[in-house]
Amino acid sequence: MAESQVERFTFQAEINQLMSLIINTFYSNKEVFLRELISNASDALDKIRYQSLTDASVLESKTELEIKIIPDKTAKTLTLIDSGIGMTKTDMVKNLGTIARSGTKNFMEQLQSGAADISMIGQFGVGFYSAYLVADTVIVHSKNNDDEQYVWESSAGGEFTIALDHTEPLGRGTKIVLHMKEDQLDYLDETKIKNLVKKHSEFIQYPISLLTIKEKEVDEETTAKEGEEESTDAKIEEIEEEKEKKKVKVQEKEWDVLNKTKPLWTRNPSDVTKEEYNSFYKSISNDWEEPLAVKHFSVEGQLEFKAILFVPKKAPFDLFESKKKANNIKLYVKRVFIMDNCADIIPEYLNFVRGIVDSEDLPLNISRETLQQNKILTVIRKNLVKKCIELFNEIAENSEDYKKFYEAFSKNLKLGVHEDSQNREKFADLLRYQTSKSGDELVTLKEYVGRMKEGQNEIYYITGESKKAVENSPFIEGLKKKNLEVIYMCDPIDEYAVQQLKEYDGKKLVSITKEGLKLDETEDEKKKAEQDKAANEELLKQVKDVLGDKVEKVVLSTRLANSPCVLVTSEYGWSANMERIMKAQALRDSSMSSYMSSKKTLELNPDHPIVRDLAKKAAEKSKTFKDFVYLLYETALLTSGFSLDEPSSFASRIHRMIKLGLSIQDDSSATTEESTNTTTSDDIPPLEENDEPSEMEKVD
């Protein structure tokens, strides 16, 4: 082939790094390369078969859909041939080197940190490059119906070549030739290849044939004549020719089909072993680990379909990436593969569930467009959700298994609560939370309701950034004092879930950080509350005057025990935690933010010494009253989970209060600078000083 016909390309940087990592790092389980190449071949066959459902002529170039494996110990090569869709020249450039998949960088990072194993390479969309675990040179011949036959070649030196292929025509499909490394020649052994296919690819639905060399004994006929002359004399004994049979060993090439197993989902579940389920799961998922749980069932009646659903042990790295495929359910119609990314077959919040669905009722030539309006698919979807919930409840019967499941997929369950109104209560049953009484144990909502105090009609919860933040929150003080249990919700997605989960088992869910919290009071407590209100009326008015529009109102609190004050939000607005989450959203709707983060209510604890002394200062018209009010307001923002709009002003205020407490006199320049800093906001005046003794001492 003339050099001018060969085009050279440079690997995209991330691909080059990945190949370098694969080649220069020692991995013990190199055998994954065969699984990955067979999986890619199966995908290519799926694509051409799907095309053939609407255009039978695409198979004319090659009618058989199959995968062939040819080991050659003499040439030290391993060849895989499939009659799939094949690649055009453009496909080769795109798929084999210049464009990295979305997971390439992520995979390399996890591989280097030890968080991922080389066996997980297929999950990241870069399984082809596992060939370099065992080969130093890879040659790919490919023919697509829409292009000429091309050959791709690379020895992983940072570049690859593509040229027109003038070797044996493929008709259609792809042939990959691996030139094996000297220390990897055992992968050319027939027995090893058979074992690997059985282990990883037994349930690939296309025949996988291995070219084997078999020794056979054949008969070699020799004719021996007894007596050197043959006489026709009747008296002479007739000499019979005797055929002496001699065994001779000859070598013959034969194709052995390695995957003769009947499709697993068509068999009776009671006849399928755990090992078969595990093997099938690995073949469809690219997961190296066994599944956590499996559900094998069939639906009969007006609608018929069979399905196997699996729950993985770990969440995939890209579980919530917007560009990942909608789900991992493969759709078959009458044992014919149709597609593996049908968005309507299962809700997006269950996108971690893997498996297959084989329908008897959908038309074979159905397209993605008509599938979206298909009523049969709607019924299948409802059944799959129902069976998934059953499967999750089965996992919950084993606390250790459910702990693993919940750590990996609790966000998906909470999305189910948020999105699925029909099954909201069922998903709520699957939720687990720590509470103010549970320690490190997780409890169900059912368990919480079961141990509610007599007369308690509401489920109390608090949302926050972490368990430590919520268990030390001032909001929880009053409920702890009354021995009321509070649920800790520390996952950002909890905020969305409780927006839809208004009640559980007839009990309303109430946020203890919002208005509307009503705790049972004794007659003495009610009487005291009236007295406190009357005694602090002037204080509440003056605090509101100082803070102005920063708060909607100032009231006395019934939810505080040890803290002087707290800021609560309206019952139907955002909590402080939700406000924090929304501020972190780059594409948030600012108009919605200003509407939902409504005015806050400042609640004061009438029994706290700071508030009592503040009431005296209000009555005395003290010059430092405003300063203390602002400090209380700003510290309440922090302890209630809000962020400060002007942290520098708050810091200046604290510094000045420290100086006041230590009786340190500001020098004029510092005073001027501080004054400039603290008057940047018209709303927050600077600290006012007077000639009285330390005001901090008076507060103490």
From Swiss-Prot:
Residues 665-700 are annotated as: Disordered. One of its GO terms (cellular component) is phagocytic vesicle. It is found in: Cytoplasm. HAMAP family: HSP90. Molecular chaperone that promotes the maturation, structural maintenance and proper regulation of specific target proteins involved for instance in cell cycle control and signal transduction. Undergoes a functional cycle that is linked to its ATPase activity. This cycle probably induces conformational changes in the client proteins, thereby causing their activation. Interacts dynamically with various co-chaperones that modulate its substrate recognition, ATPase cycle and chaperone function. The TPR repeat-binding motif mediates interaction with TPR repeat-containing proteins. This is Heat shock cognate 90 kDa protein. It comes from Dictyostelium discoideum (Social amoeba). The lineage of its organism: Eukaryota, Amoebozoa, Evosea, Eumycetozoa, Dictyostelia.
